[in-house]
UniProtKB/Swiss-Prot annotation:
NCBIfam families: PRK13682.1-3, PRK13682.1-4. Keywords: Cell membrane, Membrane, Transmembrane, Transmembrane helix. Disulfide bonds: none annotated. The chain crosses the membrane at residues 6-26, 28-48. One of its GO terms (cellular component) is plasma membrane. It is found in: Cell membrane. This is UPF0391 membrane protein Shew185_1413. It comes from Shewanella baltica (strain OS185). Belongs to the UPF0391 family. It is a multi-pass membrane protein. Coiled coil: none annotated. HAMAP family: UPF0391 (MF_01361).
Length: 58
């Protein structure tokens, strides 16, 4: 589960870099939506991992 958390974090950071720095140009709006979507998925993944009480796997 920790693996998915790290994947969501990396994708959210990359989407944020493209969305908030203007590199994406016309796609900045889409990048912002994707950024927040993956932040939500990151939080959900962290909560599920915490509720299961299992030790994280790498």
């Amino acid at each position: 589960m920790l693996g998915w958390t790290l994947v969501f974090l990396v994708v959210a950071v990359i989407a944020g870099l493209f969305g908030f720095t203007g590199i994406a140009g016309a796609a900045a709006g889409i990048a912002k939506i994707i950024f927040f979507l993956f932040i939500v998925l990151l939080v959900i993944s962290l909560l599920i991992n915490a509720l299961k009480g299992k030790s994280p796997r790498l």
